[in-house]
């Protein structure tokens, strides 16, 4: 149903079928459900052009400075400088393209991009060009974001950067994963599923909370199981808090793989592990680092190294300078004495 102050209608040869309809000024277009499961859609634009196919069915339409509203719970609202819509032989919407300054709102979810394409059959909304989406759990920026409007899952590609609010439902808080700090991350690609409970980063993935960080080829964070997994060129760095005795001490670990459980606060590194702390270097096949609560001054409680362990310890003795001790073993343990 089209409404406007002035509407022009052109008929096909013979005068029995509509060829096209257009408005000379602002108008509204209502799409009413004609089958079970469909929802009502409304469009408002500064001008509207409609092209018809055979049988007086809508083939496509175009509008400028358009706002759309889809009646669902909550309502879905979009706006853009231009909108193009395509329909099937039954006048059912199949594809919607919105160009230039696209904006999207559905409940507490927001999105924007230079261009958006909605495929009705798959319910996928693709945002292209300076794409961004946000909800109360955080925000995602990327060159391209593809959103499943039915499940809420999405994929972000190209120059991905994310900001996630602290999770109060996670496991124990530590330097590796804090329940009190915002987590930021970058990668070439990211996917989010299960209502943002499962996050996957790949391609030069980096995540950090304050000064504490982890980087790897790929990174997975599962809020439902309280697990974080990193694979390929893994490097973690976390800091003890500043104390009256001196500046913060950092612990850096490199490995091929990492699995961390916030329930146990155990970080399990495997594959050519290399640990560095001031005055201590440990190389091993695998290492289990037991982290303290994030409120503790020291981040590392203890660490167990296994397999071809090589240890270098440096101490400074008054009047004698530095003293270096080295050792090898199949097993070694580090215990924090604080």
Task: Write out the residue ranges for each language-model feature.
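Mature-chain termini and adjacent capping regions
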Residues: 1-338
């Amino acid at each position: 149903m089209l409404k406007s102050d002035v509407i022009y209608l052109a008929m096909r040869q013979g005068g029995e079928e509509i060829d096209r309809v257009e408005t000379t000024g602002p108008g509204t277009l209502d799409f009413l459900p004609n089958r079970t499961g469909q929802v009502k859609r409304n469009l408002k634009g500064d001008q509207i052009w409609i092209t018809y196919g055979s049988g007086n069915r809508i083939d496509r339409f175009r509008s400028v400075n358009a706002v759309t509203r889809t009646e669902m719970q909550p309502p879905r609202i979009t706006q853009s400088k231009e909108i193009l819509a395509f329909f099937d032989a039954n006048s059912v919407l199949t594809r919607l393209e919105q160009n230039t300054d696209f904006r999207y709102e559905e409940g507490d979810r927001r999105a924007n991009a230079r261009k958006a394409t909605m495929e009705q059959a798959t319910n996928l909304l693709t945002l292209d060009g300076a794409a961004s989406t946000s909800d109360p759990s955080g925000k995602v920026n990327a060159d391209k974001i593809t959103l499943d409007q039915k499940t809420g899952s999405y994929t972000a590609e190209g120059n991905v950067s994310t900001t996630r609010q602290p999770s109060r439902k996670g496991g124990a808080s530590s330097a590796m994963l804090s329940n009190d700090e915002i987590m930021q991350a970058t990668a070439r690609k990211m996917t989010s599923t299960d209502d943002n409970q499962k996050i996957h980063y790949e391609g030069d993935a980096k995540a950090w909370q304050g000064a504490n960080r982890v980087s790897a080829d790929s990174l997975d964070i599962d809020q439902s199981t309280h697990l974080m997994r990193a694979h390929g060129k893994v490097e973690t760095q976390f800091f003890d808090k500043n104390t009256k005795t001196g500046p913060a001490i950092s612990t850096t670990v490199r490995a091929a793989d990492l699995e961390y459980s916030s329930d146990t606060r155990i970080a399990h590194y495997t594959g050519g592990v290399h640990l560095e702390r001031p005055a201590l270097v440990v190389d091993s096949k695998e290492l289990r680092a037991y982290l303290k609560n994030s409120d503790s001054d020291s981040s590392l409680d203890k660490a167990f190294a296994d397999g071809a362990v090589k240890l270098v310890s440096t101490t400074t003795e008054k009047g004698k300078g530095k003293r270096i001790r080295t050792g090898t073993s199949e097993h070694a343990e580090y215990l924090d004495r604080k």
